């Protein structure tokens, strides 16, 4: 369901005046802009922190661009959002090879993400950060093939989350891509297509058949 289109809150003169605090503009943009729009303009996160790094001209341009592009909250699907956020995060990479794997147009992401518990929406992992996760992996028929969540209280005490460097190929691609869109504390359900999971070969040791979609519940508990 599409969100109601917001109205312009200020004129150009009001936007540029000293009387209007930057925080008010940032709050308006965060309230009404889509996640990918905010990511592109580096407006995600705590308002105070954004206000420190964003100058007034940048905010005025973002405000005008929001209404020109009509990329309001609720206008994009989750897969579109994650693709946009992924592209923004990749923009920090070296641009020397325009035909590298990252810049090829591969179409929409090969996974869907449903948020089960919201994170802090401030701390997002970057490529190369170490992330710590609890997870359960299931096949489409509900069979659990892997988990690090212990049910017995004795084992729970000694249980540790899975820790790895994100975005560098240590895990299946669906995980690498999805975790870059999650904030600390977030729990999400990921449905990952075979192309971004174990593909045509499957994973016989884990009893994952070839060409199998995998479902994970992943909780991002910490980022280093």
Curated annotation (Swiss-Prot):
FK506- and rapamycin-binding proteins (FKBPs) constitute a family of receptors for the two immunosuppressants which inhibit T-cell proliferation by arresting two distinct cytoplasmic signal transmission pathways. PPIases accelerate the folding of proteins. It is an enzyme of class 5 (isomerase). It comes from the Eukaryota. Keywords: Acetylation, Isomerase, Nucleus, Phosphoprotein, Rotamase. GO terms for molecular function: peptidyl-prolyl cis-trans isomerase activity. The modification N6-acetyllysine is found at residues 99, 170. InterPro entries: FKBP3, FKBP3_BTHB, PPIase_dom_sf, PPIase_FKBP_dom. This is Peptidyl-prolyl cis-trans isomerase FKBP3. Residues 128-224 form the PPIase FKBP-type domain. Its main location: nucleus. SUPFAM superfamilies: FKBP-like. The modification Phosphoserine is found at residues 36, 152. Inhibited preferentially by rapamycin over FK506. Its EC number is 5.2.1.8. It is found in: Nucleus. One of its GO terms (cellular component) is nucleus. It catalyses: [protein]-peptidylproline (omega=180) = [protein]-peptidylproline (omega=0). Belongs to the FKBP-type PPIase family. Residues 89-102 have a biased composition (Basic and acidic residues). Residues 88-118 are annotated as: Disordered. The keyword Transport does not apply. Gene3D superfamilies: 1.10.720.80, 3.10.50.40. The modification N-acetylalanine is found at residue 2. It comes from Mus musculus (Mouse).
């Amino acid at each position: 369901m599409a969100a109601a289109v917001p109205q312009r809150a200020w004129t150009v003169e009001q936007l540029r005046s000293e009387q209007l605090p930057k925080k008010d503009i940032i709050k308006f943009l965060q309230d009404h802009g889509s996640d990918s729009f905010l990511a592109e303009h580096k407006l995600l996160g705590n308002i105070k922190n954004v206000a420190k790094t964003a100058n007034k001209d940048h905010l005025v341009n973002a405000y005008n661009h929001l209404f020109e592009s009509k990329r309001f909250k609720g206008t994009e699907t989750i897969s579109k959002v994650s693709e946009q956020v992924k592209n923004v995060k990749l923009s920090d990479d070296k641009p020397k090879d325009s035909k590298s794997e990252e810049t090829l147009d591969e179409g929409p992401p090969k996974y869907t993400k449903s948020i089960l518990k919201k994170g802090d929406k401030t701390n997002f992992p970057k490529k190369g950060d170490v992330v710590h996760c609890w997870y359960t992996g299931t096949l489409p028929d509900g069979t659990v093939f892997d988990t690090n969540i212990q049910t017995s209280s004795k084992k729970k005490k000694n249980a540790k989350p899975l820790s790895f460097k994100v975005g560098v190929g240590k895990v299946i691609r669906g995980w690498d891509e999805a975790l870059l869109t999650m904030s600390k504390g977030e729990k999400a359900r990921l449905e990952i297509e075979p192309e971004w999971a174990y593909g045509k070969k499957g994973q016989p040791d884990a009893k994952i058949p070839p060409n199998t979609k995998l479902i994970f519940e992943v909780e991002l508990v910490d980022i280093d």
